[in-house]
Amino acid sequence: MAMNSKRKTPPGIALLRRVRGRNWSPKTFRYAILFITFIAYACYHASRKPSSIVKSVLHPDSSTKPPQEHNSDKIYPWPMGNVFVKREIGDIDEVLLHRKSKGWEPFNGKDGTSRLGEIDVAFLACYSIGMYVAGHLGDSLDLRLFLTWGMIGSGFFVGLFGMGYFWNIHAFWFFLVMQMAAGLFQATGWPSVVAVVGNWFGKRKRGLIMGIWNAHTSVGNICGSLIAAGVLEYGWGWSFIAPGFVMSLGGVLVYLFLAAYPEDVGFPDINSNSGKFIKRKRDVEEEEEEVEEDLGTDVEGDGEGSSGSGSGYENKRSVGLLQACMIPGVIPFALCLFFSKLVAYTFLYWLPFYLSQTTIGGEYVSVKTAGNLSTLFDVGGIVGGILCGYISDKFKARATTAAAFMYAAIPAMLVYHSYGGVSQTVNILLMMVAGLFVNGPYALITTAVSADLGTHKSLQGDSRALATVTAIIDGTGSAGAALGPLLTGFLSTLGWQAVFYMLVVGALCAGLLLTRLVIAEIREKLGYVDEEVPASEPLLTDRR
């Protein structure tokens, strides 16, 4: 399927170029691409957090003690006193919540946690299914427009979910449908942003660059938690409307300023080996060397610069799902991500609820505080993503690094569950360590590994497969992301220990699924050449 050859320069860039009178360098555009895609996907993740924040409001636990009045500033100095506090008499919604224990129909019954798990799985199942379609469309359509409409549509349906509060809706099907629609639109995000970054950056040190860039996941989670928790006292509906509005604004930013392809702003396709671009070769190469020094990345291919805007590039055909699945390494990493995201998304959707329903230092924390406290898991995730990317680049061993982190996540989670209630300080430290090991391999696989495989040498530079490969890997992972929260909804009724045992099994399976690739990487390090295991080749070497 040929790509549209009539793409236009983004209107915001076109306007600024007219005002400025000349174009920017490739180096400047690369920085802009990293920044805009970072903001875009942070918005995606921010809009996913509200459901985890409001769980304790929709389904209150009547067994917990009512809030007690106290002066929080005497416990924690500013700014901690305004963020990490116990249940306060000043939190009007929480006082009413514990006084009446009403919650919100249809989530306040005995099967409330199960229904909360069902709306999570509805979102993630549609997200997973939509990912496969979105990946192929992303390789076939204009990524800028595709991402724009995905963000606006997602923000719209996230906001509609929150309107159920103001419209006094208690029909389960309404919330289910809103989550399903939001999940389909959310599927446009990840394949698109990875493909855009892959269009502008080569493979060398891709793990470190994308490890840093992938902090948008945790930054989005943190911002989403803080926004949703911050407006919760005005009604839980605002916890959805505010992130949904921010999401739509992000879509406008993408439409105006995202140059999804170098060709759209007058530069060659770095993944092309065609040599059809004949102008500005020396200038482009000089800029590429500067970017390599600043960002640790090189530019592949021997394409040459063009001063055109986007209408003069060569057409690219997108690859099919089956062809993309045949790329060595795609299936093992996709299956690994299934279990990795099962673990990560269980924390994403249930950690605030878990924190509000368990004692920390002998005290219960408020719903708002639980949401704020859960952000520290993502702080650890930021460090984990960067560290995992750096190590995988240093040793040229993506699979070994990912597997090692997954195995390390097992004791980290068990220790957190066993000793996280000792005190708030211990809880924070153990939570960050768990976040480091859980989110590290998840970040590595969804970014650097996906981009590596999407530009695999078997494609010979003749196809666009970045979005499709990313969709296959992340779509499979999202099936696990749907399963984890669903199982948690049922297992939590048996006790949280059962949930953590499930997480341990998931992490173990994720590591074991990479065993074959780990062995191949170790054999290569020892000087053996195993031609029967080609899956690791694009992940270990810089050979073109």
Swiss-Prot record:
A molecular function GO annotation: glucose 6-phosphate:phosphate antiporter activity
Cellular component aspect of the GO annotation: membrane; plant-type vacuole
Membrane topology category: Multi-pass membrane protein
Annotated compartments: Membrane
Pfam families according to UniProt: MFS_1
Entries under InterPro entries matching the protein: MFS, MFS_dom, MFS_trans_sf, SLC37A1_2, Sugar_P_transporter
CDD domains linked to this entry: MFS_SLC37A1_2 (cd17344)
Parts of the chain that traverse the membrane: 28-47, 121-141, 156-176, 181-201, 218-238, 240-260, 319-339, 342-362, 371-391, 402-422, 428-448, 471-491, 494-514
Chain intervals with Acidic residues compositional bias: 285-303
Main location, first listed in the record: membrane
Region (Disordered): 281-313
Family recorded in the similarity comment: Belongs to the major facilitator superfamily. Organophosphate:Pi antiporter (OPA) (TC 2.A.1.4) family.
Protein name from the UniProt record: Putative glycerol-3-phosphate transporter 4
